[in-house]
């Protein structure tokens, strides 16, 4: 069953964030993950959303998603990610 990760993002350091984004995509492949959508908030319709940006990525299953998140390749980027932005990551399945 597919699993999805949704990241809500508030960029604090655009240069650090740009460097993170340039590298993070390569970490998905070994876990058969891919980005479905990246975008900026266009406006609130109901309630308050965290972040000005969002990313949605799909993995074949929750185990693959968790293995990606815990992988040395991704873990090595977390300090750069945290320097560049406030990020909330949440996993979802059916």
Set out the residue ranges of the language-model regions.
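Short S/T/G/P-rich N-terminal loop/turn motif that feeds into the first structured element of a domain
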Residues: 1-70, 91-94
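C-terminal end-helix/capping segment
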Residues: 82-94
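Low-complexity, intrinsically disordered Gly/Pro/Thr-rich segments
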Residues: 71-78
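Short, conserved catalytic or adaptor-binding loops enriched in Gly and charged residues
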Residues: 26-27, 80-82
């Amino acid at each position: 069953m597919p699993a999805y990760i949704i990241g809500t993002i508030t960029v604090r350091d655009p240069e650090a964030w740009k460097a993170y984004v340039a590298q993070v995509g390569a970490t998905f492949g070994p876990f058969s993950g891919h980005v479905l959508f990246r975008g900026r908030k266009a406006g609130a319709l109901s309630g308050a959303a965290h972040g000005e940006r969002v990313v949605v990525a799909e993995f074949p299953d929750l185990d693959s998603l968790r293995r990606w998140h815990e992988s040395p390749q991704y873990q090595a980027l977390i300090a750069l990610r945290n320097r560049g932005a406030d990020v909330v990551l949440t996993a979802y399945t059916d």
